[in-house]
Amino acid sequence: MKIIISPAKKMVEDTDSFDISKLPIFKDKAEVLLTWLKSKNYDELKNIWKCNDKIAKLNYDRVQDMNLDENLTPAVMAYSGIQYQAMGPQVFTQEALQRAAKDLYIISGFYGILGAMDGITPYRLEMQAKVDINDQHTLYQFWGDSIYQELYRDNELVVNLASKEYSKAIERYLKPQDKFIICSFKKEKNGKYVQQATAAKQARGDMVRYILENNIKEIDEIKNFSVNGYQYEPQFSTDTELVFIKN
């Protein structure tokens, strides 16, 4: 069983606490993106990043000095968004950390696909960003089916805990025989069950921790998840989507 998650915009460096396992599988393609980013001026990058001046300045300076071989942080420790705070990889048990290194993958606009303990450097490039590299105008075009091919190299079950922006890079290439399970986290609002972005990020992080720390390997075991009021609801679920409702 493999688990996929989204990255986070907010990143940190921690080159001392944990060892990296290897470099990203698509580091060469990340180098192409880095060269492209370095060819842009400040205003062009700010437009690509769609952010304020403070964030643009931080990331512009990062791009100028970026080296994909030095001062690397394990990927799962490098992001610090809501999902990662809920996941708490810094305090994983040793067994959960080993399982993460083997089965947890992060889909990235810049690196393509990352193993949890792959060594990376802070960057900013969302999957929905527009690019102009050869005849490619989106990162979905740039990555093509390479992320999908790497993820399904072993034909394993994939549990999707990524947002649509990132899972889209895989879902468009899925074949009928591919095992791809979506986990959705919803709560009632005005008589309807809806997924709220912030609450879903928190729940996805909780689910990752639940799977890793309980060494879960089967879909039926995932259904036992009950954290922060969420319960599996079979009446809303299908063969390809597990729906959890917060009461």
UniProtKB/Swiss-Prot annotation:
Name its GO BP terms in alphabetical order: response to hydroperoxide
What is the protein's name according to its record?
A: UPF0246 protein LSL_1719
Q: Which HAMAP family match?
A: UPF0246
InterPro entries, per database record: YaaA
Alphabetized NCBIfam families for the sequence: PRK02101.1-4
Q: Which family does it belong to?
A: Belongs to the UPF0246 family.
Q: Which organism is it from?
A: Ligilactobacillus salivarius (strain UCC118) (Lactobacillus salivarius)
Q: Which GO terms describe its cellular component?
A: cytosol
